[in-house]
UniProtKB/Swiss-Prot annotation:
Gene3D superfamilies linked: Frizzled cysteine-rich domain (1.10.2000.10), Low-density Lipoprotein Receptor (4.10.400.10), Trypsin-like serine proteases (2.40.10.10)
Positions of the catalytic residues: 910 (charge relay system), 959 (charge relay system), 1052 (charge relay system)
Knockout mutant characteristics: Mice develop normally, are viable and fertile but develop hypertension. They display increased body weight associated with impaired maturation of pro-NPPA which can be restored by injection of Corin. Spontaneous and salt-sensitive hypertension exacerbated during pregnancy is also noticed. A cardiac hypertrophy is also detected together with a decline in cardiac function later in life.
Membrane topology, as annotated: Single-pass type II membrane protein
UniProt protein name: Atrial natriuretic peptide-converting enzyme
């Protein structure tokens, strides 16, 4: 096969390589608490299998990535890093010559290079390795010493009776040992301390804690060490182990855990003194967080610190008030969470204290609800939550631990009993949902009863899985007897964006309705900003991650993950690999994708997967390296990088040292480059940006005078045009004559001359006077000849529903009037202002006062109002009657949407990426199961799609669109509009709201509507979760810090709604981007802020309803 190369290579000449190519940088910044920011603090990753002397071997730490540093510093100033991997000239050579450096140097310059750079890096590595491994070895020696067991020590070997000896290899120039990867640390089984060991009673004096590192402890006095390992080990050495783990940020409170072992709290009980060791839950949290880091040096959590030896905080002791030291001690909360307004969860997460005992699982482990008191008329759940007794035995897990569904009496004629004793409604049996934990409600069910299709083998699959190109039936029967329009394209044949295969899209009736010349062409230009500096310029979709468009790729998890991972320097060619799967190269001759070579994928995964593991993330499952061809294949071409391929993407800032940091870190007040170059020249002018006078915010020049204010005082939209005295300035800074303003005809290209022409103003009696603007002046309307149909037109034009009251109010002397044209009924005008003309008098001297009633919205007559569950679950019909499904043929469901009026729907703009033709879309209402038609279902075609003009695919900002339906919906209990907020109505942080949609639950999209309750998170806190995106006031963050429920329960365009007093529900957000469904560490979802866009939404509806026909005419 042919390998694509972007430069001429000479494979016979190799440059010497070292473990830190050209440099070893260090960063003393403590890694941030979030997962993506934590990656930045890891520094550089090492070369697997490379020994200090350059020989090919298993690696000094026996892992695929190891800790290293450039130089040794005194204790307290040590800087840990992951060494950067080598930049091989040709990846192919890596397998033939191994990962080690060549034995012979070609030139004296290379020798000098090794002496000055390689040796300090290796020395620093050895020091850290020695500390970690010597600690493990010390644990072993101390344990046998404390248990009167003497190991036999020889040169390089430690022999323990009954234990296979472990060889320790020493370098000649150092005393640092290395453990081969095939061997593991033996498990010692010392005597477990008895309960008395954990709370030693004696009469010794309590001592003050003087060790500087342990001043973080929430107590000040201690006893002599209690654990044998601490007694028989140097204290500095013991604490240094936890200090290094702390700097690796594997667990927020790891240093506190180590200090609580070294200095147990001294508790006075009369004449006795006893010390408290950490609680078992504290130990388990520390072990869970840091064991993966220890695994990177082929070690494990020390058996001498096994958690089973510690007491559980729930254990009681009649003579001791506290049995162990817990993170949840009242006097320790303030210092551990950084303030008295926070609560410390058992997991170590800090949440606002006001969230404690509020009935919500904010900690993800219910510890914020664990010690709450319930009133007598409420049921106390096992999780600590308080419930009304009416919620017991109703089939819903309201408690979160099923404690409200235990010991229930089932009516077997109407209910089904699950294996755990829970009772569920009989209609839930065989409906395709696993309502029972043991899934007994879906046993022996026909596929049809679940709304599914039966394979020949009897397996059930959704109907949309038929003829989709994937064999979902184990016997492959779902891909048999497929028509040509459904058959996936054979290799080498051009295909549309959908699934049909054609020779050309132009004029072909075989093309799917959502295909076009642009997306059916062989190649398309790369527009994904992240990959704009590739050696190729065209791509072909779908990509290797399953994204169908570049827009879908830009908002994917991988588009945020890979740039953040690049910062760790785990692999020089990681960004190149990421782009080859996000925007695959398109062969201009064949129109086919060119995949990356398998070796490139394998190297990327081997060197960077362990870094993800440290922060609890996994390598993207769709990047299975076996799907890519070997370089030596004869029948397929694959991609390998040039030596000079650019490591930093356009979304990164390149430090002077060459390191890549995210562009969002540029000029953020914190030095991310090792040379601080990212914090230099940070003024707006120095960066060729425009500066807002009020807050010194920097704006791109393309945002100045574009019709949308960006500065807080709107100064970026001032002095943008020079209109004459007889002209007025449009919102887009065009000039229009005054006498054309609010005349019922569109003169500004953005229609702004006809905005807000009809309003209601209050007078002294609190009546709402009808006011109409003509020629930029306000006028009251004379009541002479007024009809009720005009009141209806006025209320409708203002988007205020039907008129409920029309009054005639006495006018004032000398005011200016607008009167109806004598023949107004024959004018066929669509707006009120074009039916009125200026007059000096009004014979009746009466003016119009209106009271418009908003349409009834946000009601759920068919919902079971008291059924709510944290953590997300399948919803029931009628609970969310405004939820709709935006669909196209043949793809089916694409996005969620929200009904806001009988003919109007909201969704996000990115759903229409590359598919803005209204003819290919339809909207389905009143449906819960996408694969099962409902008797309440209504379908409408799309008439108009209106994307926000400021929508940006690069930053996913202004992500909103208004959709006009072909016909009004029929309002029922299952199809009803939601309320819109007022422009001034914003959500307070820590408000709880609901998200709904057909989101992602596992590998495939669920076909039942999902719902989940989420908490509103402040924007400043939200920004800390997302390095690659900027959180603006046009966005809302919602979810939980723990990631339990986020918008993976919903899908793009789906609603975020909050209940208001009176039982009405208001739409505050549309699911936009942010959440990662299979990770609990990346934080909340991000939603378009509907309150910000209410004015724009109402304006679009007004323009389409009243002005569009006139402007087209």
């Amino acid at each position: 096969m042919g390998r694509v190369s972007f430069s001429v290579r000479v494979s016979s000449v190799r440059r010497a390589r070292c473990s830190c190519p050209g440099r070893c940088y260090l960063s003393c910044r403590v890694p941030p608490t979030t997962a993506l920011r934590a990656l930045n603090g890891l520094g550089c990753a090492g070369v697997p299998g490379e020994t200090a002397g350059g020989a090919v071997g298993p690696g000094p730490l026996g892992t695929r990535g190891f800790l290293s540093g450039s130089k040794f510093q005194a204790p307290g100033s040590w800087k840990d890093c992951f060494g950067a991997p080598p930049a091989p000239d040709v990846l192919r050579a890596d397998r033939s010559v191994g990962e080690g450096c060549p034995q012979k140097l070609v030139t004296a310059n290379l020798l000098r290079f090794l002496l000055l750079v390689l040796i300090p890096c290796i020395c620093a590595l050895i020091v850290l390795l020695a500390i970690l491994l010597s600690f493990v070895g010390t644990l072993k020696r101390v344990y046998f010493k404390s248990n009167d067991s003497e190991p036999l020590v020889t040169d390089g070997e430690a022999r323990v009776p009954g234990v296979i000896p472990v060889n320790t290899v020493y370098y000649e120039n150092t005393g640092a040992p290395s453990l081969p990867p095939s061997q593991s640390t033996p498990a010692w089984t010392p005597r477990a301390p008895s309960p008395e060991d954990q709370s030693h009673r004696n009469t010794s004096t309590c001592m003050n804690i003087t060790h500087s590192q342990c001043q973080i402890l929430p107590y000040h006095s201690t006893l002599a060490p209690l654990l044998p390992i601490v007694k028989n080990m140097d204290m500095e050495k013991f604490l240094k182990f936890f200090t290094y783990l702390h700097r690796l940020s594997c667990y927020q409170h790891i240093l506190l855990f180590g200090c609580s072992l070294a200095f147990p709290e001294c508790v006075v009980d009369g004449d006795d003194r006893h010390g408290l060791l950490p609680c078992r839950s504290f130990c388990e949290a520390a072990k869970e967080g840091c064991e993966s880091v220890l695994g990177m040096v082929n070690s494990s959590w020390p058996d001498s610190l096994r958690c089973s030896q510690f007491r559980d905080h729930t254990e009681t002791n009649s003579s001791v008030r506290k049995s162990c030291f817990s993170l949840q001690q009242e006097h320790g909360k303030q210092s551990l969470c950084g303030g008295g307004e926070s609560f410390l969860c058992t997991s170590g997460l800090c949440v606002p204290k006001k969230l404690q005992c509020n009935g919500y699982n904010d900690c993800d482990d219910w510890s914020d609800e664990a010690h709450c008191n319930c009133s007598k008329d409420l049921f106390h759940c096992g999780t600590g939550k308080c419930l009304h007794y009416s919620l017991l035995c109703d089939g819903y897990d309201d408690c979160g631990d099923l404690s409200d569904e235990q010991n229930c009496d089932c009516n077997l004629t109407k209910e089904h009993r699950c294996g755990d004793g829970r009772c569920i409604a009989a209609e839930w049996v065989c409906d395709g949902d696993h309502d029972c934990v043991d899934k007994s409600d879906e046993v022996n069910c026909s596929c049809h009863s679940q709304g599914l299709v039966e394979c020949r083998s009897g397996q059930c699959i959704p109907s949309t899985f038929q003829c989709d190109g994937d064999e979902d039936c184990k016997d492959g029967s779902d891909e048999e007897n497929c028509s040509d329009s459904q058959t996936p394209c054979p290799e080498g044949e051009q295909g549309c964006l959908g699934s049909s295969c054609v020779e050309s899209c132009a004029g072909s009736s075989l093309c799917d309705s959502d295909s076009s010349l642009s997306n059916c062409s062989q190649c398309e230009p790369i527009t994904l900003e992240l990959c704009m500096n590739l050696p190729y310029n065209h791509t072909h979709y779908p990509n290797y991650l399953g994204h169908r468009t570049q827009k879908e790729a830009s908002i994917s998890w991988e588009s945020s993950l890979f740039p953040a991972l690049v910062q760790t320097n785990c692999y020089k060619y990681l960004m190149f690999f990421a782009c080859t799967i996000l925007v695959p190269k398109c062969d201009v001759n064949t129109g086919q994708r060119i995949p990356p070579c398998r070796l490139l994928c394998e190297h990327s995964k081997e060197r960077c997967e362990s870094v993800l593991g440290i922060v609890g993330l996994q390598w993207p499952e769709d990047t299975d390296c076996n799907q890519f061809p070997e370089e030596s294949s004869d029948n397929q071409t694959c991609l390998l990088p040039n030596e000079d391929v650019e490591e930093c993407s356009p979304s990164h800032f390149k430090c002077r040292s060459g390191r890549c940091v995210l562009g969002s870190r540029r000029c953020d007040g914190q030095a991310d480059c090792d040379d601080d170059s990212d914090e230099e020249n940070c003024g707006c002018k120095e960066r060729a940006l425009w500066e807002c006078p009020f807050n010194k915010q920097c704006l791109k020049h393309t945002l100045i005078c574009d019709g949308f204010p960006d500065c807080p005082d709107s100064m970026d939209e001032k002095n943008c045009s020079f209109c004459q005295d007889n002209e007025l300035e449009c919102a887009n800074h065009e000039c229009v004559p005054r006498d054309l303003w609010c005349d019922g005809w569109v003169d500004c290209s953005d229609s702004s001359d006809e905005w807000g022409c009809v309003t209601l103003s209050k007078n002294g009696n609190s009546s709402s006077l009808l006011t109409v603007h003509k020629s930029a002046k306000e006028h009251h309307v004379c009541a002479d000849g007024w009809r009720e149909t005009l009141s209806q037109l006025a209320c409708k034009q203002m988007g205020l529903g039907e008129p409920s009251v029309t009054k005639l109010i006495p006018g004032q002397e000398g005011q200016q009037w607008l009167r109806l044209y004598p023949n107004w009924e024959n004018l066929n005008g669509s707006t009120l202002q074009e039916l009125l003309v200026y007059r000096h008098s009004c014979p009746s001297r009466s003016e119009i006062s209106l009271l418009c009633s908003k349409q009834d919205c946000g009601r759920r007559p068919a919902a079971r109002m008291n059924k709510r569950i944290l953590g997300g679950r399948t919803s029931r019909p009628g609970r969310w009657p405004w939820q709709c499904s935006l669909q196209s043929e043949p793809s089916g469901h694409i996005c969620g949407c929200v009904l806001i009026a009988k003919k109007w729907v909201l969704t996000v703009a990115h759903c229409f990426e590359g598919r803005e033709d209204a003819d290919v879309w339809k909207v389905v209402f009143g449906i819960n199961n996408l694969d099962h038609p409902s008797g309440f279902m209504q379908t409408r075609f799309v008439k108009t799609i209106l994307l926000h003009p400021r929508y940006s695919r690069a930053v996913v900002d202004y992500d909103i669109s208004v959709v006009e339906l072909s016909d009004d919906i029929n309002e029922t209990s299952y199809v009803r509009p939601v309320c819109l907020p007022s422009p001034e109505e914003y959500l307070e942080p820590d408000t709880y709201c609901y998200i709904t949609g057909w989101g992602h639950m596992g590998n495939k999209m669920p076909f039942k509507l999902q719902e989940g309750e989420v908490r509103i998170i402040p924007l400043e806190q939200c920004q800390s979760y997302f390095d690659m995106k900027t959180i603006t006031n046009r966005m809302i963050c919602a979810g939980y810090e723990s990631g339990t429920v986020d918008s993976c329960m919903g899908d793009s365009g789906g609603p975020l709604v909050c209940e208001r007093p009176g039982g009405q529900w208001t739409l505050f957000g549309l699911t936009s981007w942010g959440s990662v469904c299979f990770s609990k560490v990346l934080g909340p979802g991000v939603y378009s802020n509907v309150s910000y866009f209410v004015g724009w939404i109402e304006r679009q509806i007004y323009i389409q309803t009243f002005l569009q026909k006139k402007s087209q005419g």
